[in-house]
Amino acid sequence: MRINKYLAREGVATRRAADELVARGKVLLNGRVAVLGEKVNKGDKVELRGKSSPKKHLYFAYHKPIGVITHSPQKGEKDVKQSVPMDVFPVGRLDKDSSGLLILTNDGRVTDRLLNPEYDHEKEYRVRTLDPIRDSFKKTMEAGVSIEGYQTKPCTVRKTGPKSFMITLTEGKKHQIRRMVAAMHNTVVELERTRILNVRLDDLKPDAWRPIEGKELDTFLAQIGMKELDATR
């Protein structure tokens, strides 16, 4: 497999971050500096310069408030990493204007598996709209709607009020819920992610975090195909 994928599976970094490590000459393959795109074969020895032992894998649930940035903050913007004192990164994105559950980890394998479009990983959201929801809204949304030429996958919708609903998706296109609601001639005014697979936001306060551990972690890892429990975590 390619060296960036290998490093991600070993929990060193995401594939993109692994490419950066390789480009900076921080990765050794069989004692020499690795190059981008190289393949790692059975029996090869991969080392990180300056790293002598495997790191402990960490997993956290974080309640991202509105206004906090998950990736590439600009000057003056608050980054998720400012709220969590550990060396972890967010798995996936959550819009600046949205709030709710983010999973933070230093295990690159989680990013690769959770964001892989080949798998259907449930994510649940609480949504409030500007205008009242039409009678046809639930049926149409659940069947899938066309957003700029793309037909969304079937989903589950539960109306919770005249202008509110819960939605469970198994995909994560950019601004998907906002675009789906716009296709239904309405506007999202509040969007909060409440669940990723078995990990729930529950009563976690905004800008607070908690560890994912024990049975909750075992179930989460099993649901993304990581049934083996990593001895380094």
For each of these PLM feature ranges, what is it?
Residues M1-R233:
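Basic, flexible Lys/Arg- and Gly-enriched helix-loop patches that mediate nucleic-acid binding at interfaces
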